[in-house]
Design a protein with these regions (language model features):
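Conserved ASCE/P-loop NTPase catalytic core
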Residues: 1-114, 178
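Non-catalytic alpha-helical coupling and interface elements of nucleotide-dependent molecular machines
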Residues: 63, 90, 94, 133, ...
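Residues immediately C-terminal
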Residues: 67, 72-74, 120, 134, ...
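Conserved nucleotide-binding/hydrolysis micro-motifs of P-loop NTPases
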Residues: 72-74, 104-105, 111-112, 118-122, ...
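Helical "lid/switch" subdomain of P-loop NTPase nucleotide-binding domains
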Residues: 78-81, 120, 124, 128
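Short, structured coil segments at secondary-structure junctions
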Residues: 108, 131-132
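Conserved C-terminal "switch" segment of AAA+ ATPases
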Residues: 121-125, 138-186, 198-203
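Conserved C-terminal helix/linker of AAA+ ATPases
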Residues: 182-189, 196-218
Length: 218
């Protein structure tokens, strides 16, 4: 159990003697790793000071989702990770080595998602790509989708929505200048909030704040 990855359900058995009390009933986990991932992250890590072992990330994600974000930009090479995971991805089992050298078999029962903005053909060869059978391309949003994302996020930032400012944003900073990305609404709103905090004022969608946000961001 790792409180950073696992959320207890609060479920309590009427007969506590029916299972080992060291087990905790949790919701399906969703574990996300990014550029900090190393080859040691997928192995058991032993702390010599506390003499405790920490489970690897993929074991913590069992029965849930394991997301490798920014795949290809980790400290570990993509081919090294796939070499390590060829058996787990195919057989849904993994073999981990304990500090005493004994290997133990554990389940690899999770949905593994690799996210990247690099062409997969530039990351891995054909043999490795076959181990990842489904590839889903996420296209750039349309102006209407871009607006929907902004409309959804603005209240979360405490910003009142203004349709006229959305039109200004698209015409001034996107049309004929750059493609729209799904991350742009969040990042632009972040810039607006930061600019307002610096000026000690309430964040609002104005031409001045939009221009300042885009100037800093792009």
């Amino acid at each position: 159990f790792d409180p950073q990855c696992h959320e207890p359900t609060g479920h309590s058995d009427k007969n506590p003697t029916s299972y080992d009390q060291r087990w905790i009933h949790i919701k399906r986990p969703a574990v996300i790793v990014g550029g900090e991932m190393e080859l040691s992250s997928v192995e058991i890590n032993h702390n010599p000071t506390t003499n405790l072992c920490e489970a690897p990330m993929q074991l913590k994600a069992n029965c849930g989702i394991f997301v490798v974000d920014d795949f290809g930009r980790q400290r570990i090479k993509p081919e090294d990770l796939l070499n390590r995971w060829i058996l787990p991805l195919e057989k849904r089992i993994d073999f981990l080595t304990l500090p005493n050298g004994i290997k133990v078999q554990v389940p690899f029962d999770e949905l593994v998602i690799f996210c990247t903005n690099i062409d997969p053909k530039n990351l891995l060869d054909e043999a490795f790509l076959r181990r990842i059978p489904y590839k889903i391309r996420v296209y750039d949003p349309s102006p209407e989708q871009f607006k929907q994302i902004m409309t959804f996020l603005a209240p979360k930032y405490g910003i009142e929505w203004d349709d006229s400012m959305m039109t200004y944003l698209l015409e001034r900073h996107f049309e004929g200048k750059r493609p729209m990305r799904c991350c742009h609404p969040r990042d632009i709103l972040d810039q607006v909030v930061n600019a307002a905090a610096y000026r000690r004022t309430r964040p609002v969608l104005t031409r001045e704040f939009i221009d300042l946000a885009c100037m800093c961001y792009f």
